[in-house]
Swiss-Prot record:
Disulfide bonds: none annotated. The keyword Endoplasmic reticulum does not apply. It is found in: Cytoplasm. This is Phosphoribosylformylglycinamidine cyclo-ligase. The keyword ATP-binding applies. The gene is purM. PANTHER family: TRIFUNCTIONAL PURINE BIOSYNTHETIC PROTEIN ADENOSINE-3 (PTHR10520:SF12), TRIFUNCTIONAL PURINE BIOSYNTHETIC PROTEIN ADENOSINE-3-RELATED (PTHR10520). Keywords: ATP-binding, Cytoplasm, Ligase, Nucleotide-binding, Purine biosynthesis. One of its GO terms (biological process) is 'de novo' IMP biosynthetic process. Pathway: Purine metabolism; IMP biosynthesis via de novo pathway; 5-amino-1-(5-phospho-D-ribosyl)imidazole from N(2)-formyl-N(1)-(5-phospho-D-ribosyl)glycinamide: step 2/2. GO terms for cellular component: cytosol. Its EC number is 6.3.3.1.
Length: 345
Protein backbone atom coordinates (compact mmCIF):
# COMPACT_ATOMS: atom_id res chain seq x y z
CA UNK A 1 0.00 0.00 0.00
CA UNK A 2 1.44 3.46 -0.90
CA UNK A 3 1.92 4.89 2.60
CA UNK A 4 2.80 8.40 1.42
CA UNK A 5 -0.48 8.73 -0.49
CA UNK A 6 -2.38 7.21 2.45
CA UNK A 7 -0.83 9.78 4.77
CA UNK A 8 -2.05 12.51 2.41
CA UNK A 9 -5.62 11.29 2.86
CA UNK A 10 -6.08 9.16 -0.26
CA UNK A 11 -6.87 5.45 0.18
CA UNK A 12 -5.78 3.43 -2.84
CA UNK A 13 -7.18 0.28 -1.25
CA UNK A 14 -10.61 1.88 -0.85
CA UNK A 15 -10.46 2.80 -4.53
CA UNK A 16 -9.82 -0.82 -5.46
CA UNK A 17 -12.71 -1.86 -3.23
CA UNK A 18 -15.10 0.53 -5.02
CA UNK A 19 -14.16 -0.91 -8.43
CA UNK A 20 -14.69 -4.43 -7.11
CA UNK A 21 -18.12 -3.53 -5.71
CA UNK A 22 -19.46 -1.78 -8.81
CA UNK A 23 -18.52 -4.37 -11.43
CA UNK A 24 -21.77 -6.30 -11.08
CA UNK A 25 -23.80 -3.10 -11.39
CA UNK A 26 -21.94 -2.05 -14.53
CA UNK A 27 -22.42 -5.51 -16.05
CA UNK A 28 -26.22 -5.27 -15.98
CA UNK A 29 -26.13 -2.16 -18.20
CA UNK A 30 -24.52 -4.01 -21.11
CA UNK A 31 -26.18 -3.50 -24.49
CA UNK A 32 -25.47 -4.19 -28.18
CA UNK A 33 -22.52 -2.16 -29.39
CA UNK A 34 -20.44 -2.33 -26.23
CA UNK A 35 -16.92 -3.65 -26.79
CA UNK A 36 -15.09 -5.05 -23.75
CA UNK A 37 -15.67 -4.13 -20.11
CA UNK A 38 -14.54 -1.56 -17.57
CA UNK A 39 -10.92 -1.24 -16.52
CA UNK A 40 -9.36 0.09 -19.71
CA UNK A 41 -8.29 3.66 -20.31
CA UNK A 42 -11.43 4.32 -22.36
CA UNK A 43 -14.86 2.83 -22.99
CA UNK A 44 -15.37 1.25 -26.41
CA UNK A 45 -18.55 1.26 -28.50
CA UNK A 46 -19.08 -0.11 -32.02
CA UNK A 47 -21.49 2.34 -33.64
CA UNK A 48 -21.39 0.58 -37.01
CA UNK A 49 -22.95 -2.53 -35.48
CA UNK A 50 -26.26 -0.70 -34.95
CA UNK A 51 -27.00 -0.24 -38.63
CA UNK A 52 -27.63 3.50 -38.78
CA UNK A 53 -27.37 4.91 -42.32
CA UNK A 54 -26.39 8.49 -41.47
CA UNK A 55 -25.69 8.45 -37.74
CA UNK A 56 -25.35 11.72 -35.85
CA UNK A 57 -23.96 11.55 -32.32
CA UNK A 58 -25.80 13.62 -29.72
CA UNK A 59 -24.16 14.24 -26.35
CA UNK A 60 -25.06 15.81 -23.04
CA UNK A 61 -23.68 16.32 -19.56
CA UNK A 62 -25.33 17.29 -16.29
CA UNK A 63 -25.38 16.77 -12.55
CA UNK A 64 -28.03 16.78 -9.85
CA UNK A 65 -27.16 20.05 -8.09
CA UNK A 66 -27.93 20.42 -4.42
CA UNK A 67 -30.38 17.52 -4.45
CA UNK A 68 -27.23 15.75 -3.23
CA UNK A 69 -27.54 17.68 0.03
CA UNK A 70 -31.04 16.28 0.56
CA UNK A 71 -29.68 12.77 -0.08
CA UNK A 72 -27.02 13.44 2.54
CA UNK A 73 -29.58 14.71 5.07
CA UNK A 74 -31.77 11.65 4.50
CA UNK A 75 -28.76 9.30 4.33
CA UNK A 76 -30.25 7.84 1.16
CA UNK A 77 -27.88 7.51 -1.79
CA UNK A 78 -29.30 4.69 -3.90
CA UNK A 79 -31.48 6.79 -6.23
CA UNK A 80 -29.42 9.93 -6.80
CA UNK A 81 -27.59 8.12 -9.62
CA UNK A 82 -30.90 7.64 -11.44
CA UNK A 83 -31.33 11.41 -11.31
CA UNK A 84 -27.91 11.93 -12.83
CA UNK A 85 -28.63 9.60 -15.74
CA UNK A 86 -32.10 11.07 -16.24
CA UNK A 87 -30.84 14.64 -16.49
CA UNK A 88 -28.42 13.65 -19.24
CA UNK A 89 -30.44 11.16 -21.28
CA UNK A 90 -33.61 13.26 -21.19
CA UNK A 91 -31.66 16.15 -22.69
CA UNK A 92 -30.35 14.12 -25.60
CA UNK A 93 -33.69 12.35 -26.05
CA UNK A 94 -35.19 15.80 -26.59
CA UNK A 95 -33.22 15.86 -29.86
CA UNK A 96 -34.45 12.43 -30.91
CA UNK A 97 -31.44 10.47 -29.69
CA UNK A 98 -31.27 6.82 -28.72
CA UNK A 99 -28.93 6.79 -25.69
CA UNK A 100 -25.91 4.56 -26.31
CA UNK A 101 -23.46 4.90 -23.47
CA UNK A 102 -22.91 6.80 -20.25
CA UNK A 103 -19.97 7.79 -18.05
CA UNK A 104 -20.06 9.11 -14.50
CA UNK A 105 -17.74 11.26 -12.41
CA UNK A 106 -17.79 11.17 -8.62
CA UNK A 107 -15.62 13.49 -6.54
CA UNK A 108 -15.48 12.94 -2.79
CA UNK A 109 -13.59 13.95 0.32
CA UNK A 110 -13.15 10.37 1.52
CA UNK A 111 -13.66 7.19 -0.45
CA UNK A 112 -16.49 5.27 1.24
CA UNK A 113 -16.92 2.05 -0.79
CA UNK A 114 -20.35 1.18 0.63
CA UNK A 115 -21.78 4.63 -0.05
CA UNK A 116 -20.25 4.92 -3.51
CA UNK A 117 -21.60 1.49 -4.41
CA UNK A 118 -25.09 2.82 -3.64
CA UNK A 119 -24.50 5.82 -5.89
CA UNK A 120 -23.20 3.75 -8.80
CA UNK A 121 -25.99 1.20 -8.33
CA UNK A 122 -28.39 4.08 -8.91
CA UNK A 123 -26.47 5.16 -12.00
CA UNK A 124 -26.74 1.59 -13.29
CA UNK A 125 -30.48 1.53 -12.56
CA UNK A 126 -30.88 4.70 -14.61
CA UNK A 127 -28.80 3.30 -17.45
CA UNK A 128 -30.95 0.16 -17.56
CA UNK A 129 -34.09 2.31 -17.73
CA UNK A 130 -32.57 4.34 -20.57
CA UNK A 131 -31.12 1.39 -22.48
CA UNK A 132 -27.69 2.96 -22.11
CA UNK A 133 -24.44 1.18 -21.23
CA UNK A 134 -22.28 2.41 -18.37
CA UNK A 135 -18.91 2.14 -20.11
CA UNK A 136 -16.67 4.02 -17.71
CA UNK A 137 -16.28 6.60 -15.02
CA UNK A 138 -13.99 8.29 -12.54
CA UNK A 139 -13.98 8.35 -8.76
CA UNK A 140 -11.74 11.13 -7.46
CA UNK A 141 -10.87 11.18 -3.77
CA UNK A 142 -10.02 14.81 -3.04
CA UNK A 143 -9.24 15.47 0.65
CA UNK A 144 -9.07 19.17 1.34
CA UNK A 145 -11.37 19.96 -1.57
CA UNK A 146 -14.41 18.24 -0.02
CA UNK A 147 -15.29 17.32 3.56
CA UNK A 148 -15.04 13.60 4.31
CA UNK A 149 -18.82 13.10 4.08
CA UNK A 150 -19.28 15.15 0.89
CA UNK A 151 -19.39 14.07 -2.72
CA UNK A 152 -20.43 15.48 -6.08
CA UNK A 153 -21.80 13.60 -9.06
CA UNK A 154 -21.87 14.35 -12.78
CA UNK A 155 -22.75 12.32 -15.83
CA UNK A 156 -22.02 12.27 -19.54
CA UNK A 157 -24.32 10.69 -22.11
CA UNK A 158 -23.83 9.95 -25.80
CA UNK A 159 -26.65 8.91 -28.09
CA UNK A 160 -27.36 8.61 -31.80
CA UNK A 161 -30.06 9.57 -34.27
CA UNK A 162 -30.45 9.28 -38.01
CA UNK A 163 -29.53 12.63 -39.53
CA UNK A 164 -32.96 12.83 -41.17
CA UNK A 165 -34.74 12.10 -37.88
CA UNK A 166 -33.12 14.68 -35.59
CA UNK A 167 -35.79 16.54 -33.61
CA UNK A 168 -34.94 20.24 -33.57
CA UNK A 169 -38.28 22.07 -33.61
CA UNK A 170 -37.62 23.67 -36.99
CA UNK A 171 -40.89 22.39 -38.49
CA UNK A 172 -43.11 23.55 -35.62
CA UNK A 173 -45.99 25.63 -36.99
CA UNK A 174 -48.95 27.64 -35.76
CA UNK A 175 -51.74 25.29 -34.67
CA UNK A 176 -49.48 22.47 -33.50
CA UNK A 177 -50.62 20.76 -30.32
CA UNK A 178 -48.56 20.69 -27.12
CA UNK A 179 -48.65 17.42 -25.19
CA UNK A 180 -47.16 17.11 -21.71
CA UNK A 181 -45.69 14.01 -20.08
CA UNK A 182 -45.98 14.07 -16.28
CA UNK A 183 -43.04 14.36 -13.92
CA UNK A 184 -42.53 12.25 -10.82
CA UNK A 185 -41.86 15.24 -8.58
CA UNK A 186 -39.39 18.10 -8.33
CA UNK A 187 -36.89 16.06 -10.39
CA UNK A 188 -33.37 17.56 -10.03
CA UNK A 189 -33.69 21.33 -10.40
CA UNK A 190 -34.41 24.17 -8.01
CA UNK A 191 -33.12 22.44 -4.90
CA UNK A 192 -31.36 25.51 -3.51
CA UNK A 193 -34.80 27.13 -3.30
CA UNK A 194 -36.38 23.85 -2.15
CA UNK A 195 -33.98 23.62 0.78
CA UNK A 196 -34.40 27.30 1.70
CA UNK A 197 -38.21 27.19 1.55
CA UNK A 198 -38.77 23.87 3.29
CA UNK A 199 -35.88 23.54 5.72
CA UNK A 200 -34.97 27.16 6.55
CA UNK A 201 -38.24 29.08 6.19
CA UNK A 202 -40.78 26.39 7.11
CA UNK A 203 -38.54 24.55 9.58
CA UNK A 204 -39.28 21.12 8.13
CA UNK A 205 -36.79 18.25 8.09
CA UNK A 206 -36.40 15.27 5.78
CA UNK A 207 -38.38 13.26 8.36
CA UNK A 208 -41.35 15.65 8.44
CA UNK A 209 -44.59 13.94 7.45
CA UNK A 210 -47.17 16.24 5.85
CA UNK A 211 -50.84 15.44 5.29
CA UNK A 212 -50.62 17.24 1.94
CA UNK A 213 -48.08 14.61 0.85
CA UNK A 214 -50.13 11.66 2.06
CA UNK A 215 -48.12 11.32 5.24
CA UNK A 216 -44.98 10.36 3.34
CA UNK A 217 -41.66 11.63 4.68
CA UNK A 218 -40.63 14.87 3.03
CA UNK A 219 -37.17 13.52 2.25
CA UNK A 220 -38.63 10.55 0.39
CA UNK A 221 -40.87 12.81 -1.69
CA UNK A 222 -38.00 15.13 -2.57
CA UNK A 223 -35.71 12.23 -3.45
CA UNK A 224 -38.22 10.60 -5.81
CA UNK A 225 -36.02 9.91 -8.87
CA UNK A 226 -36.30 12.04 -11.98
CA UNK A 227 -38.39 10.25 -14.60
CA UNK A 228 -36.48 8.89 -17.59
CA UNK A 229 -38.55 9.50 -20.74
CA UNK A 230 -36.52 7.51 -23.27
CA UNK A 231 -38.89 4.55 -23.56
CA UNK A 232 -41.94 6.83 -23.63
CA UNK A 233 -40.53 8.87 -26.52
CA UNK A 234 -39.02 6.07 -28.60
CA UNK A 235 -42.26 4.88 -30.30
CA UNK A 236 -43.16 8.47 -31.15
CA UNK A 237 -39.76 9.10 -32.72
CA UNK A 238 -40.01 5.90 -34.75
CA UNK A 239 -43.44 6.97 -36.02
CA UNK A 240 -42.12 10.43 -36.89
CA UNK A 241 -44.90 12.26 -35.06
CA UNK A 242 -42.77 14.58 -32.91
CA UNK A 243 -41.79 18.02 -34.20
CA UNK A 244 -40.13 19.34 -31.07
CA UNK A 245 -39.38 18.38 -27.48
CA UNK A 246 -38.71 20.54 -24.43
CA UNK A 247 -37.19 18.93 -21.34
CA UNK A 248 -38.56 20.94 -18.40
CA UNK A 249 -35.55 21.45 -16.16
CA UNK A 250 -34.05 24.57 -14.54
CA UNK A 251 -36.09 27.58 -15.60
CA UNK A 252 -39.33 25.62 -15.71
CA UNK A 253 -41.89 26.19 -18.43
CA UNK A 254 -40.89 29.80 -19.06
CA UNK A 255 -37.30 29.15 -20.10
CA UNK A 256 -37.43 25.65 -21.56
CA UNK A 257 -40.49 25.52 -23.82
CA UNK A 258 -39.32 28.49 -25.96
CA UNK A 259 -36.04 26.66 -26.62
CA UNK A 260 -37.80 24.34 -29.07
CA UNK A 261 -39.95 26.98 -30.80
CA UNK A 262 -38.93 28.90 -33.96
CA UNK A 263 -38.90 32.71 -33.87
CA UNK A 264 -42.28 34.32 -34.41
CA UNK A 265 -44.21 31.55 -32.67
CA UNK A 266 -45.26 31.01 -29.07
CA UNK A 267 -46.56 28.27 -26.80
CA UNK A 268 -49.98 29.00 -25.34
CA UNK A 269 -50.37 26.87 -22.21
CA UNK A 270 -53.77 26.33 -20.59
CA UNK A 271 -53.18 26.10 -16.85
CA UNK A 272 -55.34 23.50 -15.14
CA UNK A 273 -55.14 20.95 -17.96
CA UNK A 274 -52.94 18.64 -15.89
CA UNK A 275 -52.66 17.76 -12.18
CA UNK A 276 -50.02 19.80 -10.35
CA UNK A 277 -48.30 17.52 -7.84
CA UNK A 278 -48.88 18.33 -4.13
CA UNK A 279 -45.18 18.96 -3.46
CA UNK A 280 -45.38 22.12 -5.58
CA UNK A 281 -48.26 23.49 -3.50
CA UNK A 282 -46.22 22.78 -0.37
CA UNK A 283 -43.21 24.58 -1.86
CA UNK A 284 -45.24 27.58 -3.00
CA UNK A 285 -46.74 28.10 0.47
CA UNK A 286 -43.57 27.36 2.44
CA UNK A 287 -41.46 29.72 0.36
CA UNK A 288 -44.19 32.33 -0.19
CA UNK A 289 -43.42 32.10 -3.91
CA UNK A 290 -45.56 33.88 -6.50
CA UNK A 291 -47.69 31.31 -8.34
CA UNK A 292 -46.61 32.41 -11.83
CA UNK A 293 -42.95 32.43 -10.73
CA UNK A 294 -43.27 28.75 -9.87
CA UNK A 295 -43.52 28.08 -13.62
CA UNK A 296 -40.21 29.88 -14.09
CA UNK A 297 -38.43 27.61 -11.59
CA UNK A 298 -40.03 24.16 -11.38
CA UNK A 299 -41.56 21.60 -13.75
CA UNK A 300 -44.94 21.89 -11.96
CA UNK A 301 -45.80 18.27 -12.72
CA UNK A 302 -44.77 18.16 -16.39
CA UNK A 303 -41.31 16.83 -17.29
CA UNK A 304 -41.50 16.84 -21.09
CA UNK A 305 -43.50 18.92 -23.58
CA UNK A 306 -43.97 17.66 -27.14
CA UNK A 307 -45.04 19.65 -30.20
CA UNK A 308 -47.27 17.53 -32.48
CA UNK A 309 -49.07 18.23 -35.76
CA UNK A 310 -52.81 18.39 -34.87
CA UNK A 311 -53.55 15.82 -37.58
CA UNK A 312 -51.37 13.33 -35.67
CA UNK A 313 -52.40 14.21 -32.13
CA UNK A 314 -54.60 11.13 -31.68
CA UNK A 315 -51.87 8.89 -33.09
CA UNK A 316 -49.34 10.32 -30.64
CA UNK A 317 -51.70 9.95 -27.68
CA UNK A 318 -52.46 6.34 -28.65
CA UNK A 319 -48.76 5.49 -28.90
CA UNK A 320 -48.26 6.89 -25.41
CA UNK A 321 -51.32 5.08 -24.03
CA UNK A 322 -50.19 1.79 -25.60
CA UNK A 323 -46.95 2.23 -23.65
CA UNK A 324 -48.86 3.02 -20.43
CA UNK A 325 -47.57 6.59 -20.49
CA UNK A 326 -49.99 9.25 -19.19
CA UNK A 327 -50.20 12.41 -21.29
CA UNK A 328 -52.05 15.72 -21.22
CA UNK A 329 -52.94 18.20 -23.96
CA UNK A 330 -51.51 21.43 -22.54
CA UNK A 331 -52.21 23.94 -25.29
CA UNK A 332 -51.05 24.88 -28.76
CA UNK A 333 -48.62 26.89 -30.85
CA UNK A 334 -49.76 30.41 -31.76
CA UNK A 335 -48.24 33.55 -33.25
CA UNK A 336 -45.89 35.26 -30.79
CA UNK A 337 -47.58 38.53 -29.85
CA UNK A 338 -45.69 39.15 -26.60
CA UNK A 339 -42.07 38.57 -27.60
CA UNK A 340 -41.69 35.93 -24.88
CA UNK A 341 -42.60 32.86 -26.97
CA UNK A 342 -44.78 31.55 -24.13
CA UNK A 343 -48.13 32.53 -22.65
CA UNK A 344 -49.67 30.94 -19.55
CA UNK A 345 -53.47 31.28 -19.52
Amino acid sequence: MPKAYENAGVSVEAGYEVVKRIKSHVARTNRPGVVGGIGGFGGLFDLASLGYKEPVLISGTDGVGTKLMVAKLANKHDTIGIDCVAMCVNDIAAQGAEPLFFLDYIACGKNDPALLEQVVAGVADGCVQAGSALVGGETAEMPGMYDEDEYDLAGFSVGVAEKSAIVDGSTIAEGDVLIGLPSTGVHSNGFSLVRKALFEQAGYTVDTELDELGGEKLGDVLLTPTKIYVKALSPLFKAGVVKGVAHITGGGFIENIPRMIPDGLAAEIELGTWPVLPIFDVLEKAGNIDHKEMYNIFNMGIGMVLAIDPARKDEALKLLADNNEPAYVLGSITADTTGTQIVLK
